Regions:
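Extracytoplasmic small-molecule ligand-binding "clamshell" domains
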Residues: 31-108
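Periplasmic-binding protein-like
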Residues: 36-50, 124-134, 213-253, 259-286
Length: 286
């Protein structure tokens, strides 16, 4: 091939180097030319607004997929970690993964376009997305926040917030929205008086005690609990791969996979019925 490899091809080739024997690689300079083993099963992770390092999360994913491939009898499994749906979309189009790990909003938002079917759920310690809260320093009820400034880094998908997170308790349009980019920035907006209230998740509320001024902030509303991680198959996934993954899904964090799950905070993967989230899907789809 004479064309210069794309940055995506280089990244995938580097990941493949973790999954093939060292004898297949002649040197670091040749990593970009190493092809994925035939039969490699593709994965993607889309964890929106997750805390922690994306590069660390990628290393945990690589280790977990290496363990899964061994357990499932696949030649290899590889995947990529994303924090934005927009960036994940290009990867999906180019690599056509079979499976994914999604935050709940990402799953609902990407489900129809990709033919996603829920296979399981998992807990994710301290990574957020399992419950949402409205917090304030001055207000003591949700109604007292309405019409006031509301900071949030969870407002990218207003539909998810309005029809799933809020449970019809509010719409983002009920507030003067102050969009933030980072989890801690959202909390500090309330502490510093830049916003009257804020919409945060369980990971953010757990950090209040560690942030200067956080003790003065309190929740005025809490959502219902929801799955932190949805494990799903893509519509294009071969049936044989789906059946094999289903057999090993609940053992993801056992054996060689335990260390990667522990490091990533992933716990208790368990199967669900394909229609487990039918109500939320119907609400989101309108």
């Amino acid at each position: 091939m004479t064309a210069r490899p794309s940055s995506l091809a280089i990244a995938l080739s580097c990941a493949a180097a973790l999954l093939v024997p060292p004898v297949a690689v002649a040197g670091a300079a040749q990593l970009e030319e190493v092809a994925q083993p035939a039969g490699t099963v593709g994965f993607i992770v889309v964890r929106e607004n997750g805390s922690g390092s994306a590069s660390a999360a990628q290393s945990y994913l690589d280790a977990l997929l290496t363990s899964l491939a061994k357990r499932a009898g696949w030649p290899a499994a590889s995947g990529k970690y994303f924090t934005k749906r927009s960036k994940a979309k290009k990867f999906i189009e180019e690599t056509k993964p079979s499976f994914g790990f999604f935050s709940f909003g990402a799953y609902l938002g990407m489900r129809k376009a990709n033919g996603l079917t829920a296979m399981g759920v998992a807990d994710a310690n301290a990574t957020g997305g399992a419950q949402y809260f409205v917090i304030s320093k001055s207000a003591f009820t949700l109604d007292a926040c309405k019409g006031k400034t509301l900071a949030s880094n969870h407002a990218d998908d207003a539909r998810f917030v309005d029809v799933v997170v809020s449970g019809d308790a509010f719409d983002l349009a009920d507030f003067e929205l102050v969009e933030t980019k980072r989890p801690v920035q959202t909390v500090k907006a309330v502490i510093n008086g830049e916003a009257e209230c804020a919409l945060i998740d369980d990971a953010q509320i757990s950090t209040l005690a560690t942030i200067d001024g956080g003790a003065a902030v309190h929740p005025v509303w809490a959502s219902e609990a929801m799955p932190a991680v949805i494990i799903a198959s893509f519509g294009s996934a071969p049936a044989e791969q789906v059946d094999t993954f289903a057999k090993h899904l609940e053992a993801l964090c056992e054996g060689d996979g335990k260390g990667a799950c522990d490091a990533a905070g992933l716990t208790a993967p368990r199967k669900v019925e394909a229609d487990a989230f039918a109500a939320q899907q119907a609400a989101y789809d309108g």
